[in-house]
Design a protein with these regions (language model features):
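Bacterial N-terminal signal peptides that target proteins for export
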Residues: 1-10
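Bacterial Sec-exported substrate-binding components of ABC uptake systems
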Residues: 5, 14, 21-84, 183-215, ...
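A short, structured surface patch at a secondary-structure boundary
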Residues: 58, 77-131, 135-142, 244, ...
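Short helix-initiation/N-cap motifs at beta->coil->alpha
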Residues: 62-66, 117-126, 248-257
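His/Asp/Glu-enriched short active-site or ligand-binding loop at hydrolase and phosphoryl-transfer sites
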Residues: 102, 228-252, 272, 303
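Short helices/loops that flank or line small-molecule/ion binding pockets
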Residues: 123-132, 152-153, 255-264
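A ligand-binding cleft/hinge motif common to bilobed small-molecule-binding domains
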Residues: 143-152, 267-285
Length: 341
């Protein structure tokens, strides 16, 4: 009985940590999507060469927190403190150099075999140090508590903080730069940009009044959603929708049922945390007070096929964009092959 009572609370607390990974751009005005400029790089006379043959080390880069970091040599032992960064590292062909990850790094399959040194925001510093990493790739959730401790230990840490699809592309290139995989990163982001453009060329001219009102839900008790300055908001806009809370607040927040009713979303997109999407979906559609909300009345509540496609700011975000675009505009993009409703 005690475990059953604690489980919802623990899930909620875990989710609060998880949603800190999802952040991005616009608010009351439609966003513009000029490519994010690359992080400033101050070249230092090269002493070593990367695996792709470019004389890039040592280098100085600026991470997403504006920190100037010197990368003295080509990293050989990398620890990732975020599932999205783990996916980026593997996509760049660096799986063999990853020596530590988090409890939630489960993609690709090979990531599951890596030593675990952290939850979402609480790395085991002693275990991490035992792995002797020469590069740690962290996330903005680690800025206040974890980053200072790692810096005091003299560890080399870069921090990513995606707030739009453009900054996700930038983070791929940043990680590629510091690991000697700039060429591979450029190829990966070029492919991602093409897929994003394939969607936005069909949605960019849709006027605000023609965009369906979209509510994104990642937890149900209470309802957690995203405002502006999050990559989820940017993704919804690029997919041709309008995030109903974009002009109300930034980042993530719990909202009341009354607020949802007042916004009257025409489409509800549910991601969930891990495998909890079905639980959230059932809670939303069975909530009597929401029965007159347009999305529920019109049977337009959708559960993402894999929550990680939209929750993780990594290479698979383009798959999430494709899926959301089909939910919002099936008349343009077609109905998803295996629609989850």
């Amino acid at each position: 009985m005690k475990d059953s009572l604690l489980r919802p609370l623990l899930l909620t607390l875990l989710f609060v940590s998880l949603i800190s990974f999802a952040c991005q751009t616009p608010s009351s005005e439609p966003p513009t999507f000029a490519p994010s400029p690359p992080a400033p790089t101050e070249e230092i006379p090269a002493e070593t060469k990367s695996e792709e043959g470019l004389p890039t080390f040592p280098i100085v880069v600026v991470d997403d927190l504006g920190r100037k970091i010197t990368i003295q040599h080509l990293p050989q032992r990398i620890v990732s403190l975020a599932p999205s960064n783990t996916e980026i590292l593997f996509a760049l062909g660096l799986g063999d150099k990853i020596v530590g990850t988090t409890d939630y790094c489960d993609y690709p399959e090979a990531a599951k075999a890596k030593p675990r040194v952290a939850g979402y925001s609480n790395p085991n510093i002693e275990k991490l140090m035992s792995l002797e990493p020469d590069l740690i790739v962290a996330e903005s959730i680690h800025e206040r508590m974890v980053l200072p401790a790692l810096e005091r230990l003299g560890l080399t840490v870069i921090v990513t903080s995606a707030t739009s699809l453009d900054t996700i592309l930038h983070d791929v290139e940043l990680i590629g730069q510091v690991t000697g995989k700039s060429v591979t990163a450029a190829q990966l982001t070029e492919n991602m940009r093409k897929r994003i453009e394939a969607v936005t060329e069909k949605t960019r001219n849709i006027q605000i009044e023609q965009r369906p009102r979209v509510l994104y839900v990642c937890w149900h008790n209470p309802i957690w959603t995203m405002g502006s300055d999050t990559f989820i908001d940017d993704l919804i806009w690029k997919a041709g929708g309008m995030n109903v809370f974009a002009s109300d607040f930034k980042k993530s927040r719990a909202v009341s049922l009354e607020a949802v009713i007042d916004k009257d979303p025409q489409i509800i997109i549910i991601s969930g945390m891990g495998t909890t999407g079905g639980l959230i979906y059932n809670s939303i559609i069975k909530e009597a007070r929401l029965r007159d909300v347009s999305a529920i009345a019109d049977n337009r509540v959708y559960k993402i096929s894999d929550a990680n496609l939209i929750e993780r700011p990594g290479p698979r975000i383009v798959d999430g964009l494709d899926e959301v675009a089909k939910y919002i505009h099936p008349e343009i993009f077609g109905i998803p092959a295996s629609i989850s409703k």
